[in-house]
């Protein structure tokens, strides 16, 4: 995770107390503080994803690019990871294949097929039975809750 501080260090500069605090804060945010002494290779797939996110957070990014950040995570950690990312207060561009999670945690969505944008907008506008048919070739029914959760039934 300390490698996330590398862009902020000059050649041969040692990490500062602030660097260590930022790394510890990042580990705390992703729930990996208790495992910080373990080798990366000994971690599960989900734990590795959380460590990678912690490394990115240690960089203090203004924009965070995430490719399937919830892949291999248990449901609890999927929800926690996306809630954390949403609460960071920075711009995030994420690729998610779980449409229901994307709707719940995204302010704006792009649905793509073959590299082309098929639908875009706030989740309620972009995710429709018609757009899911166009992108995934499935029939569906969508019910929206007041807190922007999409309940998708595939028919």
Specify the residue positions occupied by each region the protein language model found:
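Conserved ABC ATPase signature
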Residues: 13-14, 39-43, 47
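A short, proline-enriched helix->beta-strand linker immediately N-terminal to the Walker B motif
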Residues: 58-62
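Conserved ABC ATPase "signature" region
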Residues: 17-35
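ABC ATPase nucleotide-binding domains
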Residues: 129-155
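Catalytic Walker B motif of ABC-type/P-loop ATPase nucleotide-binding domains
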Residues: 64-68, 73
